């Protein structure tokens, strides 16, 4: 949806294409996304947009970073995150938390589903818990 970026737990990409090629293909759906914006998004998550390595050779953490780049390349007003730190090493988690906090400070609304209390503490102003289909405000 326009104005919304979504990060899923296990992003799927075309294995025989580079990270840039995958995002370029998706960007064709939104003609307003330039190659430079795609490259900037890839750089923001700590990947090299000029890297020709095929996504099939990416580590799980690299694919997760590319998924985050995909979600932010349209500069969405709202980011929906499903376990956004899955597959990232300690350094990657720290980098992505900093990026997401920066986006939040710039006015992006962030909705996060996570089992990680630290992600929730760092990224969320309000916390809700879902249990047996019931949603309860925690704080």
Language model: regions and residue ranges:
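Catalytic Walker B motif of ABC-type/P-loop ATPase nucleotide-binding domains
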Residues: 79-83
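Conserved ABC ATPase "signature" region
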Residues: 24, 33-50
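Helical segment within the ABC ATPase nucleotide-binding domain
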Residues: 94-106
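H-loop/switch region of ABC-family ATPase nucleotide-binding domains
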Residues: 114-115
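Hydrophobic anchor residue at the start of the ABC signature
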Residues: 68
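Helix N-cap at the start of a conserved alpha-helix in ABC-type nucleotide-binding domains
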Residues: 90-91
């Amino acid at each position: 949806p326009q104005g919304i970026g979504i990060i899923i737990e296990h992003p799927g990409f075309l294995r025989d294409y580079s990270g840039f090629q995958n995002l370029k293909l998706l960007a064709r759906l939104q003609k307003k996304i330039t190659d430079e914006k795609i490259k900037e998004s890839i750089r923001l998550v700590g990947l090299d947009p000029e890297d020709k390595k095929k996504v099939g050779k990416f580590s799980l953490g690299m694919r997760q970073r590319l998924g985050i780049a995909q979600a932010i390349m349209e500069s969405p007003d709202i980011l929906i995150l499903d376990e956004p730190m899955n597959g990232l090493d300690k350094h990657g988690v720290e980098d992505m938390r900093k990026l997401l906090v920066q986006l939040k400070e710039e006015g992006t609304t962030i909705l996060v589903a996570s089992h990680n209390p630290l992600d929730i503490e760092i990224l969320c102003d309000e916390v809700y818990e879902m249990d047996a289909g019931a949603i309860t405000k925690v704080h």
